[in-house]
Regions:
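Helix-loop-helix hairpin linking two adjacent transmembrane segments in secondary transporters
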Residues: 110, 143, 147-199
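C-terminal transmembrane helical hairpin of 12-TM major facilitator-type secondary transporters
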Residues: 283-330
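Helix-to-loop junctions at the C-terminal end of transmembrane segments
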Residues: 73-85, 272-284, 368-369
Length: 399
């Protein structure tokens, strides 16, 4: 009986997954790699700063290391090997992320922290690049294009869960090392579950060869503008996404919001995907992308221009309610503009995004050390998001 159940389970792993299974698997992957793997740094960071493990400047360097890993991982993700074996690199990236989280529990060391975050960023890039083959493209081929944005909601759920976990541990007097280990266990458990949930994708018979110049997307003016816009978006969102909880902790009147500020971002992010998908259907995907950038610019500016409990809540809703939707919609536009090489286009977009993310936290951490506040870097980020939205309008005219 037991043998029959095992045989049935193994057989199910080789069957084409249902659209619901693809969407749920994609959500778990994004929750593990990004909601926890990337963004748990935000609620743990103030605890590390208070304990003397990091300063605002060194925190920016460590954050930038994660995004450097993401950038280099995205470049590596454009290789023929990842296109031939997407599941191997997908699962490997998830496991690398979990191990890197555990490594953050090491004794305080900027080089060690930077290496761990680099490894996590490198792995997460493989996850999002290979997600196209593992879940997004199969959903499109199954005629369920409406579900192709669902995996990105996993980031919001992961943020909300990890933020809640950190708050519970903090209220129990647990230190930052245990916070990292607890989140590492959750992230790794999700990765192991995905081993059974998502089988290797089957490429359609008409799929182009993964290697060679035929697989390279043509860089049209519209795609070039989108890539630049996406890089500015990466720079614009990441400063607030990295330091929001630190901004809240530094303002005495906002102290009661610290356990909730990042959870608000996560919940808004989880709910943002259906809303912005609806906006895209009622208008166009490019309009939704540009409008999202402008809404996010408002949220980023509100976090520092008038930091009251009300504006911080609005800022969290605007940030969380846009950044994953913009990510998903931007990648969808790129896939549409380069239909013959979607995974390579996704790698190019991810690289531009990663470059913007490297500059953002390093600049913000340095400016915080010299000026004593996050006001100037946050306003620069808001301006970058306005330009990103304007470039989105150019994409609409050029395509």
């Amino acid at each position: 009986m037991a043998k029959a159940r095992i045989t049935k389970a193994l057989k199910s792993m080789t069957q084409p997954p249902s659209p619901a299974r693809l969407a749920i698997g994609g959500m778990l992957a994004m929750a593990s790699a990004f909601g926890i793997g990337r963004f748990v740094y935000t609620p743990i960071l103030p605890v590390m700063i208070a304990d003397g493990a990091l300063t605002p400047a060194s925190a920016g360097i460590v954050a930038a290391a994660n995004f450097l890993g993401y950038l280099l991982g995205a470049l590596a993700g454009a290789s023929a090997a990842t296109q031939r074996h997407p599941r191997l690199f997908f699962l490997g990236g998830l496991l690398a992320g979990g191990l890197s989280l555990a490594g953050m529990a090491a004794p305080p060391s900027i080089p060690v922290f930077s290496i761990m975050r680099f490894v996590g960023g490198f792995g997460s890039a493989f996850v999002i690049v290979c997600l196209s083959s593992m879940a997004l493209e199969p959903l499109v081929r199954a005629g369920r294009i409406g579900l192709s944005a669902a995996p990105f909601a996993g980031v919001g759920f992961g943020i909300a869960f990890s933020s809640g976990l950190v708050s519970v541990l903090a209220s129990a007097g647990v230190g930052w090392k245990a916070m990292w280990v607890a989140n590492a266990l959750v992230s790794t458990a999700m990765a192991l579950l995905l081993f059974f949930l998502l089988p290797a994708p089957s490429l359609p018979a008409h799929a182009p060869a993964p290697a060679g110049r035929k697989g390279l997307p043509r860089i049209s003016p519209a795609l070039a503008a989108l890539v630049v816009s996406y890089g500015l978006f990466g720079f614009g969102y990441v400063i607030t996404a990295t330091f929001l909880v630190a901004i809240v902790r530094e303002t005495a009147s906002l102290a009661t919001l610290e356990p909730y500020a990042w959870a608000i971002v996560g919940l808004a992010g989880a709910l943002s995907i259906p809303f912005w998908s609806w906006v895209a259907r009622r208008t166009t995907d490019v309009f939704a992308y540009a409008a999202g950038c402008l809404v996010e610019a408002t949220g980023v500016a509100l976090s520092v221009v008038s930091p009251t409990p009300a504006t911080i809540i609005i800022s969290g809703i605007f940030l969380g309610g846009t950044f994953m939707a913009i990510t998903a919609i931007g990648l969808g536009i790129a896939r549409r503009l380069t239909q013959m090489a979607p995974q390579r286009a996704q790698a190019i977009m991810t690289s531009a995004f990663g470059l913007g993310q490297i500059v953002g936290p390093a600049l913000a951490g340095h400016m915080r050390e010299t000026s004593g506040s996050f006001v100037a870097p946050s306003l620069i980020a808001a301006a970058a998001l306005v330009v990103a939205g304007a470039l989105g309008a150019f994409v609409a005219r050029s395509r």
